[in-house]
Amino acid sequence: MSMRLARLLIPGFSALALAACATEGDDVADAGDPGPPAAVSTIGPPRLTADLRDSQGRVRARATAETVADSLRVRVEAVGMSPGAYGAHLHTTGRCDPPGFTTAGPHWNPTDQKHGKDNPAGMHKGDLPNLLVGTDGRGSFEYTIPNAGLSGMLPNRLIDADGASVVIHAAPDDFRTDPSGNSGARIACGVLG
């Protein structure tokens, strides 16, 4: 090897050797500054589901919630329920202790509104349409809540430290009466997870 080529290669190999000695995450320019903390994902879970169980533990419905753009889309599908109309709501706590499911907390209401789409001072973000169940014991709805999401950077996030749940009530929601639309007892509940 010529002397000229050796003078060109030696500094390059020296730099490579020094770089190989550094461990991942070392900051050669300022080893005393640990830098900013690692970024935390703000996207959150793409979709959460819940099996809504009655006080005997039987699954009566399945709920799915997902963030779509700047909205929260909720779908509820019932199976094995008596025909009729039932109020359904998102609740603030991810806990469903039978028999009354009061551990699910109040309706999700991050904007501090009154209850119901027909209430001039309403509505809660957690207000959902009535679940209409046919003679075959099945029913479903899909509903989109604007300016809301599961988690992340959206202003109205459903999921916080204590989670959230979906509750079905014994009677239809009148979409007006505060706080729960005269929808009666909580008959099925599921934790979103």
Residue ranges and their predicted role:
Residues 1-10:
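Bacterial N-terminal signal peptides that target proteins for export
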Residues 10-11, 38:
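Intrinsic disorder/low-complexity segments
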Residues 22-85, 90-193:
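N-terminal leader/targeting pre-sequences
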Residues 17-20:
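C-terminal motif of bacterial Sec signal peptides marking the signal peptidase cleavage site
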